[in-house]
């Protein structure tokens, strides 16, 4: 039995071994995508309810919420594809995005404030 290592290299030379990406990483990306889509569907349902049963102000608010829901869907799709390609390329990360959810929260807050202001004025 030899005591020599299986792979021998010259000193200072690195061996490139393939790194296996765990399937749970891909599933986590899909789970996050579905969570964003679930939020967008709830927001779209709210806008459809306002559109069907609301007055003129409700229809304006429904339009705003529809725009936010469509923006959320677009954001979710873009981030999903970006993360999936980074995972396939075995990128070192980071895979989080702090700007997108912050912008979506402020846009949603603006839509809610617009709804309240229109209700108070008219």
Curated annotation (Swiss-Prot):
Belongs to the VTC1 family. The chain crosses the membrane at residues 33-53, 60-80, 102-122. Keywords: Cell cycle, Chaperone, Membrane, Transmembrane, Transmembrane helix, Vacuole. InterPro entries: DUF202, VTC_Complex_Subunit. Residues 54-59 are vacuolar. Its main location: membrane. Residues 1-32, 81-101 are cytoplasmic. The gene is nrf1. It comes from Schizosaccharomyces pombe (strain 972 / ATCC 24843). The keyword Cytoplasm does not apply. It is a multi-pass membrane protein. GO terms for biological process: energy reserve metabolic process; polyphosphate biosynthetic process; polyphosphate import into vacuole. This is Vacuolar transporter chaperone complex subunit 1. Disruption phenotype: Defects in endocytosis.
